[in-house]
Amino acid sequence: QRQCERLRDCYKYCMSPKRCTYGTCYCEPSP
């Protein structure tokens, strides 16, 4: 299943989303 259609969808998975690629969220590393 797709996590995201656009970057802002990733905020439910990531504190700092980096990109949404092919429905998958990629996050900035947490400090």
Curated annotation (Swiss-Prot):
Transmembrane segments: none
Subcellular location: Secreted
Protein name stated in the entry: Toxin BmKK16
Tissue specificity comment: Expressed by the venom gland.
Domain description: Has the structural arrangement of an alpha-helix connected to a beta-sheet by disulfide bonds (CSalpha/beta).
Annotated GO MF terms: potassium channel regulator activity; toxin activity
Disulfide bonds: 4-20, 10-25, 14-27
Function: Blocker of potassium channels (Kv).
Protein source organism: Olivierus martensii
Entry keywords, A to Z: Amidation, Disulfide bond, Ion channel impairing toxin, Potassium channel impairing toxin, Pyrrolidone carboxylic acid, Secreted, Toxin, Voltage-gated potassium channel impairing toxin
Cellular compartments per GO CC: extracellular region
Coiled coil (UniProt feature): none
Signal peptide coordinates: none
Major site of localization recorded for this protein: secreted
Modified residues (Proline amide): 31
Family: Belongs to the short scorpion toxin superfamily. Potassium channel inhibitor family. Alpha-KTx 17 subfamily.
Post-translational changes noted in the entry: The N-terminus is blocked.
List of residues that carry Pyrrolidone carboxylic acid: 1
